[in-house]
Amino acid sequence: RAVRFVRSHAQEYGIDEADIAVMGFSAGGILSGEMLLHYDGQTDGTALDPEYVPDALDQISADAAACGMIYSFYGRLSVGITDVELLRSGDLPPTFYCYGTRDPFYDQFLANASAAEEAGVEVERLQLDGMPHGFGARGDWIPVYDEWLAGIFER
């Protein structure tokens, strides 16, 4: 609903409704990925809660133009998805992966990004040598992500 809410207020916020991306760090990235893989095309919440009452927001697209996975991946906690067909079925947007080489999930990032590429997802990777999990704003990745995202939005 967050993407739908932002899209419904795009004019008020002074943004192009096509220029909405999702991004998450660690488990937040997994949550963003779950939304993109399984729920962005859902028209309302009744599949999750039979007592849900649909409203006008449910008619607005929840598609995202891009996804930022910052020390994260498409999957569930601690396990990145490597099922190429599942990733292909998600019709995923261009995805930016940023991860450190000292992260305990390093191999998961590599495997998930490779599977996403094989599934036809446009992938950009930024590896930060020596960085652990949870590096936050350290590592000079933000300008790289910003430039990548601006390029996506210019299309």
What name fits each language-model region?
Residues D103-P104, H133:
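Glycine-/small-residue-rich active-site loops that bind phosphorylated ligands and cofactors
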Residues R1-G90:
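Primarily recognizes the serine-hydrolase "nucleophile elbow" in alpha/beta-hydrolase
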Residues D16-A18, G90, Q108, M131, ...:
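Surface-exposed loop/turn and secondary-structure junction residues enriched for glycine/proline
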Residues I20, T95, V123:
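Hydrophobic anchor at the start of a short beta-strand
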Residues C98, L110-R155:
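C-terminal catalytic histidine-bearing segment of alpha/beta-hydrolase fold enzymes
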Residues V79, P104-L110:
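Conserved alpha/beta-hydrolase "acid-adjacent" motif
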Residues S72, F96-D103:
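Conserved strand-to-loop "acid loop" that flanks and positions the catalytic carboxylate
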